Amino acid sequence: MSISLSSLIFLPIWINMAQMQQGGSNETEQTAALKDLLSRIDLDELMKKDEPPFDFPDTLEGFEYAFNEKGQLRHIKTGEPFVFNYREDLHRWNQKRYEALGEIITRYVYELLESDCNLKKISIPVDATESEPKSFIFMSEDALTNPQKLMVLIHGSGVVRAGQWARRLIINEDLDSGTQIPFIKRAMDEGYGVIVLNPNENYIEVEKQKMHKQSSSSDGTDEPAGKRERRDKVSKETKKRRDFYEKYRNPQKEKEMMQLFIRENGSPEEHAVYVWDHFIAQAAAENVFFVAHSYGGLAFVELMIQREADVKSKVTAVALTDSVHNVWHQEAGKTIREWMRENCCNWVSSSEPLDTSVESMLPDCPRVSAGTDRHELTSWKSFPSIFKFFAEASEAKSSSQKPALTRRSHRIKHEEL
């Protein structure tokens, strides 16, 4: 007879019951009850359910997936979308598989930025030595020389990297909704230079040197040889069982890694300031525009706090998408809040139609609906409105007028009419 792994949860209860049935709780009875229960466990059956190794392909082809003509990730044989639960009851393994695919997606998007969008990969820090950790951003050929317009793209926090809005959208929906590529292509078509930030690439990881544990020496007691042998035998059996259950509980321990942070780019906020100082501030463009999603909005506000005068002199308009900034917590001053009210607009997740005014408790930029209640989709759904907003802001500046700003004001006027 064998019992399932789930039954092990009740092991302490069974032991207590065995003790009660035998009419005592001395050490001999406890040991006998435990041995009896353990002898019924089918270890071979448990081993069959062991977690497979975290050995995943490093290419889309290896995963047997590819992007079709619509930019959707599909299985090359079945045509089906990506399946997360590839193996039942192995959530951790499935998650690791998903993360491995995500790393491939990141490299794939990098390749598209260079091959499809004709962007250049620029290493930072600009004065980095050969041996120190480095990151990079992407820029169009005319990013620093375009005299008219420059668009700067900042994604949110998490696993996303340059060129992405949301990994989940890329894998489960399509490249258009999940990447910044539509923004980049339209911007270039409309005469913008483009800079794509990479605010989550803050460090590199290296494996910690394994420390060799010193073997413990004998305690040197004078106990009889027979008793010591019996104790050692019990100890070995106990260790063997403990090691087995530890292997089942955590079959593949993660490698211990240490993080080496990238100089002056150790956080999204640092990265935004660094790219401003070394690239955006040097750009020739008369009008600089930002598109910042989620935590990218917080990074922009932090940039403005640290470089207020410079930002005001160069930036014409800022489109935020479901930004998580907070002018109170970030201690943005009154002049910053006033500038944001005049030059920023935040497209937030909402079930209201696109561009409908959404009330805010914070005294900063106007908030309008992105036309979706899904956070990760706000950039893609507000895509046409953002370009219209920038065009209006640019036109207003060129005619020496304040931008009528905001889709919020347009909506209110429309409703009043």
Curated annotation (Swiss-Prot):
GO terms for cellular component: cytoplasm; endoplasmic reticulum; nucleus. It holds the Pfam family Arb2. Glycans are attached at N26. Disruption phenotype: Homozygotes deficient mice die before postnatal day 25. Mice display retinal coloboma, cleft palate, and hypoplastic semicircular canals, retarded growth, genital anomalies and malformation of the heart and cranial nerves. Mice display a complex phenotype mimicking both the major and minor features of CHARGE syndrome (CHARGES). It comes from the Eukaryota. InterPro entries: AB_hydrolase_fold, Arb2, Arb2_dom. Residues 208-248, 398-417 are annotated as: Disordered. The active site is at S294. Residues 1-18 form the signal peptide. Keywords: Cytoplasm, Disease variant, Endoplasmic reticulum, Glycoprotein, mRNA processing, mRNA splicing, Nucleus, Signal. A motif (Prevents secretion from ER) lies at residues 414-417. One of its GO terms (biological process) is RNA splicing. Residues 405-417 have a biased composition (Basic residues). It is found in: Nucleus; Cytoplasm; Endoplasmic reticulum. Residues 224-237 have a biased composition (Basic and acidic residues). Plays a role in the regulation of alternative splicing, by interacting with AGO2 and CHD7. Seems to be required for stabilizing protein-protein interactions at the chromatin-spliceosome interface. May have hydrolase activity. Belongs to the ARB2A family. Interacts with AGO2. Found in a complex, composed of AGO2, CHD7 and ARB2A. PANTHER family: COTRANSCRIPTIONAL REGULATOR FAM172A (PTHR21357:SF3), FAM172 FAMILY PROTEIN HOMOLOG CG10038 (PTHR21357). This is Cotranscriptional regulator ARB2A. The gene is Arb2a.
